[in-house]
């Protein structure tokens, strides 16, 4: 399949894609605490800074990659790939651009498998309600415009799941907006959706979506954090606001994405080569992407790149006992393990907030490192510790992977289905959250190479070819259970492997009529895997960031899925922000996006040069802006 042509203005050798100016800084060293995707990204980004002369990456377990864990399993006739964490990465520009650039830089450009928008995994997504699968209204490419409209209207009037949606949308504008005093006050997703639409939409539709992303309870999750752009439209009416945004081609852009793009130096921009441009064009035709060996292939490649850099000391199974700092401009950060204590100019902490709270709460005098003659007297950062204690809630999920040799096992094709909280216990005694049809998202297209189609140097066309994780036909399913339903569970309450597989098979038989027995089964209990952004989350992050900056003289940086997004793309962006602005880079004073000097990043609409993003949680004080889509970001 040919990849669309690329505008000449973006080809290599033309005007640089972006000009950025870095502040002049002295040489420095950094400790990165946590070897998940955020920490690996931060360490990789730091290796590109000539001023950063030493990086130490601490990871408490024996492996790197965090929740991104894949397993290749031999089966009769070939192999299949099971995922225990994220199984695909969402394609959404400009955020996904950073992932592509990093993957290209570490040698994965020919390994990326894109799930195309025309595939069933992109087109067909289901919700189980009340006792069958309901396809969410989405246009089908093979059908004409009128047939698609007819099908979607039919679903809205016939399906009990969707019936409350149309009147809720049509009459939403008649609901009173928040009072002026309430605009700064957060609320739960359940409260917001019920108030603006109706409780059925919250219970049947939105709760299912939040089960799929957060395994969370919409009575607790923050509306402003997770549905902010939608909530901000209620003064004019949400449906009207959506129509006007579509009419004016206005989109929401995260300001942090603009800052990540703006940081890239001249050498990095020139690295935006033909391969990367072709990958981006292919990505624009896709909905998600992954790798032949699963998503773990990305952190594995990052770890290899860190080892090759010669600047990174990777310490797995590191027993960190304390992170401390004696206030003062010239006082370093100290990381104490059972083996030694090292001083650093900056520490980037990407571990869970509760784990960080424990490390900051330990006085260096009480640790067991052998260097007893050089103990550091440091006052405990009580304000930071108190703020961190409010970040204490994450859900636990049981992930069950199943493989069946029968390729025609499923009654439908698609990405999978989610289960809303309105499903009674009799239909969902396993506390199921959803089922992923893994086979459907395990194949797609990858970049195949280019060929000349004309006499000029730039006259060539890239092509793609089919690609797949699995080398054998069959059906691969992932069943997710637990989440907020298991908040009250004790460790002894969680199911073991045999019980989890039995529960998963029982659920599949009830929902899909599958009675066949899987030939391969794997399960993994992911304890405290998904941090919950509960009501007031944004305010807590803001206050925590201020406190950390003050207590640690802007030398401690916080990043990871406890703060600014739980997705892989969110974590990669936080790693990039932490390794640049978090350690002292200044937002560039001149920014140009693309060959047109009139097209500038969203952050340039604000007084960005005054933003001090060093230390704490490095994120722009303005979170989201609206821009017309024809503005290059």
Q: Where do the model's predicted regions map?
A:
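Conserved flavin/dinucleotide-binding core of flavoenzymes
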Residues: 29, 72, 137-139, 414, ...
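N-terminal Rossmann-like FAD-binding beta1-loop-alpha1 element of flavoenzymes
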Residues: 28-57
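Glycine-rich FAD pyrophosphate-binding loop
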Residues: 47-74
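Dinucleotide-binding Rossmann-like beta1-alpha1 core, especially the glycine-rich loop
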Residues: 76-179
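Conserved Rossmann-like nucleotide-cofactor binding loop
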Residues: 38, 63, 354
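Active-site/ligand-binding neighborhood in enzyme catalytic cores
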Residues: 166, 170-321, 330
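Mid-domain catalytic core of redox enzymes
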Residues: 49, 292, 316-477, 622-633
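N-terminal mitochondrial targeting presequence
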Residues: 1-28, 633
């Amino acid at each position: 399949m040919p990849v669309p042509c690329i505008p000449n203005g973006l080809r290599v050798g033309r005007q640089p894609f972006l000009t950025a100016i870095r502040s002049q800084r002295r040489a420095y060293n950094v400790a990165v605490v946590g070897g998940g995707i955020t920490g690996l990204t931060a360490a990789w980004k730091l290796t590109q800074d000539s001023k950063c002369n030493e990086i130490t990456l601490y990871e408490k377990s024996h492996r790197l990659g965090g929740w991104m864990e894949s397993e290749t399993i031999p089966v009769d006739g070939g192999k299949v790939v099971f995922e225990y964490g994220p199984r695909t990465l969402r394609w959404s520009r400009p955020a996904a651009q950073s992932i592509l650039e990093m993957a290209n830089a570490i040698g994965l450009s020919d390994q990326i498998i894109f799930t195309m928008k025309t595939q069933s995994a992109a087109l067909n997504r289901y919700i189980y309600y009340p006792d069958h699968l309901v396809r969410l209204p989405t246009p089908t490419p093979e059908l004409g415009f009128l047939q698609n409209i007819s099908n979607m209207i039919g679903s809205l009037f016939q399906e009990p799941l969707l019936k409350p949606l149309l009147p809720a949308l049509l009459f939403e504008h008649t609901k009173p907006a928040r009072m002026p005093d309430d605009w700064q006050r957060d609320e739960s997703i359940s409260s917001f959706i019920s108030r603006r639409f109706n409780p059925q939409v919250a219970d049947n539709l939105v709760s299912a979506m939040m089960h799929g992303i957060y395994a969370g309870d919409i009575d607790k999750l923050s509306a402003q954090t997770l549905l902010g752009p939608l909530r901000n439209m209620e003064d004019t009416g949400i449906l009207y606001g959506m129509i006007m945004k579509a009419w004016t081609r206005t989109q929401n852009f995260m300001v942090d994405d603009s800052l990540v793009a703006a940081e890239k130096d001249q050498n990095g921009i020139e690295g935006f080569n033909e391969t990367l441009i072709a990958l981006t064009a292919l990505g624009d035709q896709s909905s998600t992407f992954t790798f032949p060996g699963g998503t773990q292939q990305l952190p594995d490649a990052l770890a290899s790149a860190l080892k090759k850099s010669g600047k990174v000391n990777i310490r797995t199974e590191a027993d960190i006992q304390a992170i401390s700092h004696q206030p003062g401009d010239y006082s370093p950060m100290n990381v104490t393990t059972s083996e030694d204590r090292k001083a650093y100019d900056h520490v980037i902490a990407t571990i869970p907030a509760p784990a960080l709270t424990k490390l900051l709460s330990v006085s260096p005098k009480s640790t067991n490192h052998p260097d007893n003659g050089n103990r550091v007297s440091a006052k405990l950062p009580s304000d930071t510790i108190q703020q961190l204690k409010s970040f204490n809630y994450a859900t636990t999920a049981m992930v069950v992977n199943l493989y069946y040799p029968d390729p025609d096992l499923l009654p439908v094709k698609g990405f999978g289905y989610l289960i809303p909280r309105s499903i009674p216990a009799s239909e969902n005694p396993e506390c199921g959250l959803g089922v992923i049809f893994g086979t459907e998202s395990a194949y797609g297209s990858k970049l195949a190479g280019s060929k000349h189609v004309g006499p000029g140097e730039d006259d060539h066309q890239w092509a793609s070819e089919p690609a797949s994780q699995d080398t054998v036909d069959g059906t691969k399913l992932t069943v997710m259970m637990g989440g907020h339903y298991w908040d009250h569970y004790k460790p002894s309450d969680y199911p073991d492997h045999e019980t989890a597989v039995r529960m998963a098979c029982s659920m599949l038989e009830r929902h899909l009529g599958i009675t066949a027995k899987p030939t391969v089964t794997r399960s993994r209990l992911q304890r405290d895997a998904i941090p919950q952004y509960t009501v007031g989350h944004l305010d807590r992050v803001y206050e925590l960031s201020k406190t950390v900056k003050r207590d640690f003289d802007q030398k401690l940086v916080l990043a990871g899925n406890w703060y600014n997004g739980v997705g892989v793309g969110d974590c990669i962006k936080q790693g990039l922000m932490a390794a640049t602005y978090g350690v002292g880079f200044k937002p560039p004073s001149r920014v140009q996006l693309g060959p047109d000097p009139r097209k500038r990043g969203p952050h340039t609409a604000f007084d960005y040069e005054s933003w001090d993003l060093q230390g704490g949680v490095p994120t722009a004080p303005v979170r989201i802006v609206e821009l017309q889509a024809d503005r290059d970001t």
